[in-house]
Amino acid sequence: MSSLDKTMHFDFNQNKGKNIRDTLEDVYKALEEKGYSPINQIVGYLLSGDPAYIPRHNDARNLILKHERDEIIEELVKSYLGKDK
């Protein structure tokens, strides 16, 4: 079986959940303060990977760039499904 036939396994550090949650809350607040639609801007960033969707205001861009987008998406899915406990 070639390596292309194998399923990849993601295993993220369990302690990052709170940090990602805190980061998203801080980014959300910064976007609100700047008058943007926070959900639209965060989704735009997550889909495109373009940090220009996140302002530098209150260091929001640097904060969100500390996390991989796939880790953020994983936390969002776990939270949505109630599996974040």
From Swiss-Prot:
Belongs to the UPF0297 family. Pfam families: IreB. PANTHER family: UPF0297 PROTEIN YRZL (PTHR40067:SF1). NCBIfam families: PRK05473.1. This is UPF0297 protein Ldb1606.
